[in-house]
Design a protein with these regions (language model features):
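Active-site neighborhoods of metal-dependent hydrolases
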Residues: 1-208
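C-terminal amphipathic alpha-helical interaction region
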Residues: 210-214
Length: 215
């Protein structure tokens, strides 16, 4: 058959800016009409990060963390207690810079594993949910919990590609290629190696977005 030169890009669904992802796929369709085949790599899983506040990588794009990224746990604990730091972080969340993956969606930050037995009942719940239940600010709750556990609390943030309807729309797009496993990078934060089984289990079997043959 004839040789093809294909160009790919990567996109994810962002519930806070759903048109951005859609526009990229529309650009691909327009490129094909001009005779240029262009496809978007789209993951079928949420972009998820495991982290502790001892190495809060998902928050590093916020200027409140400038200058403290290499701090020791002891230094970080002192910073996280400071109301001025918390205010700066809140201001960052109110006015996020372009490219920031976390914009204050606390309902997408889960308490993965606690250090103290007394806090185990919060595991697998979101920071937003627990904070609302206690009528406190979610940022304060997260930092206070982390401080109580000497920054050992494990959190799980699901920051992009969240929302079945929006993600499913992009997965089904003719210019989408389900892929983008990040299994070889950022291993201390994330591993998407199981994306193939996730596609079959969720998007084929559970939701029926794809037939088995398509999957």
């Amino acid at each position: 058959g004839r040789r093809k030169f294909l160009t790919t890009g990567a996109a994810m669904y962002n519930a806070s800016d759903p048109e951005r992802g859609r526009s990229w796929f529309a650009d691909c369709a327009a490129a094909k009409e001009r005779g240029n085949e262009l496809y978007i790599q789209i993951p079928c899983q949420p972009l998820s990060f495991d982290f502790t506040m001892a190495n809060a990588y998902p928050f590093f794009s916020h200027s409140a963390f400038d200058g403290i990224k290499a701090y020791s746990p002891e230094q970080l604990m002192s910073v996280f207690k400071d109301p001025a730091f918390r205010d700066r972080f809140r201001e960052n969340l109110r006015n996020p810079v372009v490219g920031t993956i976390f914009k204050g969606t606390w309902e997408q930050v889960f308490i993965g594993a606690t250090v103290k037995e007394a806090n185990r009942h919060w595991q697998n719940r979101t920071v937003g949910d627990v904070a609302a239940e206690q009528s406190i600010d979610p940022l304060d709750f997260m930092l206070d919990l982390a401080l109580e556990e000497k920054l050992g609390t494990a959190f799980l943030g699901k920051f992009l590609n969240v929302g079945d309807e929006g993600v499913g729309e992009l997965l089904r797009h003719e210019h989408g290629v389900v892929s983008l496993s990040d299994a070889g990078a950022h291993l201390i934060y994330m591993c998407d190696a199981g994306y193939g089984l996730h596609l079959l289990g969720k998007w084929v079997r559970e939701l029926g977005v794809f037939t088995l043959q398509e999957g």
